[in-house]
């Protein structure tokens, strides 16, 4: 296994930093940071996207019967399968639970109605957006990985650190 960069931080601070940066990258699609941090963030982001790709199709349809006004009605509910549930729990443990922000000129009630159904927006984005998109690319190209790219930028003015932008493709 490849050695991990220490990034000049204690272990707990380094892990928290990487967890925050990977979460922000996956949520926003783009992150500006130092080149060394970008390389570490890229490793983790690729790993988490691969976990989502390998399990996003695992669903189970269950029929539930509810009695409403004396009449029995059956409802089909789509649940996560065992593999997808394990992947979802792993991602929830590894990423921060970012919430959707209120849009401009959106009232509090509109915001609550819009976000009511989604409890973990970042995890849903991983399974509903990134996984199908990259799975289609993988099946079309026959190549796994390469979900992110690092673009080097100029040095930071204050300390001369090499900066980079990491992007989810």
Enumerate the predicted regions with their spans.
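Basic, ligand-binding patches in group-transfer machinery
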Residues: 17
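Structured, basic alpha/beta domains of bacterial-type, RNA-associated proteins
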Residues: 2-6, 21-25, 31-35, 39-169
């Amino acid at each position: 296994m490849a050695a991990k960069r220490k990034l000049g931080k204690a272990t707990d601070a380094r892990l928290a930093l990487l967890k925050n940066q990977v979460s922000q990258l996956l949520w926003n699609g783009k992150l500006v940071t130092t080149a060394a941090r970008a390389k570490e963030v890229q490793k983790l982001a690729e790993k988490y996207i691969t976990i989502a790709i390998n399990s996003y199709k695992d669903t189970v349809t269950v029929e539930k019967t509810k009695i409403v006004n004396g009449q029995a009605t059956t409802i089909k509910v789509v649940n996560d399968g065992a593999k997808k549930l394990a992947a979802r729990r792993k991602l929830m443990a590894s990423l921060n639970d970012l919430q959707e922000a209120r849009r401009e000129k959106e009232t509090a009630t509109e915001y609550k109605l819009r976000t009511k159904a989604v409890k973990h927006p970042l995890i849903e984005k991983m399974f509903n957006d990134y996984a199908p998109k990259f799975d289609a690319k993988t099946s079309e190209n026959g190549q796994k990985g390469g979900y992110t790219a690092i673009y080097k930028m100029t040095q930071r003015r204050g300390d001369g650190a090499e900066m980079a932008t990491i992007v989810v493709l």
